[in-house]
Regions:
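Surface-exposed molecular-recognition determinants
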Residues: 2-201
Length: 201
């Protein structure tokens, strides 16, 4: 059996270069900044313009200690938030004392055909320097044939001084278009933080 070796490894061997490579550009749609806000809602800009949307949440700080940062969707431009979801959730953690680590599934933080808000991050610390960051990808929200998938990864400062790495995925179990997303804490306000909405072209 002969071995094929690829040695096309120099610029002189390239025959053509495309003028541009399309795909993957982030287009900022809107930005919202929390200031003791009970909720942050995006009720416009989520439509058929893009097949993928990304929410980036930056320096989210809760007013209340030990709470969960969460989200839900809407099919009526934000008049109500309670779309049925099925999700999965796992995370890894490591404490500052270097005495506790784990990687595991979080049974109590997933949803099974529920209209509740899905948490990104739990046991948020509300100390002056404690916060959380992450992103939520929402795919093809205006499609009226299939369910609407989403994935999220985030990190937050746990109220007991842990670094937490969170992974959430699932779908809105509806063929109706998702046209609004709301973020909130399980209790109390979002004291500070910024959420940006991007469309991916």
């Amino acid at each position: 059996m002969s071995i094929v070796v690829c040695n096309n490894n120099s610029l002189s061997a390239i025959t053509s270069i495309p003028a541009s490579i399309s795909g993957g550009a982030l287009n900022l749609i809107s930005t919202q900044t929390a200031s003791s806000s009970s909720t942050i809602s995006f009720t416009s800009g989520i439509d058929s313009t893009y097949k993928e949307y990304i929410f980036k949440f930056i320096d989210i700080h809760p007013a209340t200690d030990g709470v969960t940062f969460s989200f839900q969707g809407s099919t009526d431009t934000g008049s109500s938030y309670g779309v049925t979801m099925t999700t999965s959730f796992f995370n890894a953690y490591h404490n500052e004392a270097d005495s506790a680590t784990n990687l595991g599934y979080r049974t109590g933080e997933d949803l099974a055909q529920s209209t509740s808000f899905q948490g990104f991050q739990s046991n948020y610390g509300n100390g002056n320097d404690e916060n959380g960051v992450g992103f939520l990808h929402l795919f093809d929200p205006s499609n009226t044939t299939f369910v609407k998938h989403f994935i999220s990864r985030s990190s937050n400062y746990h109220s007991a001084d842990y670094a937490i790495d969170n992974y959430v995925a699932g779908y809105f179990n509806t063929t109706s278009a998702i046209d609004a997303i709301q973020f909130k804490m399980s209790s109390g306000n979002i004291d500070a933080g910024t959420i940006k909405l991007y469309g991916v072209s």
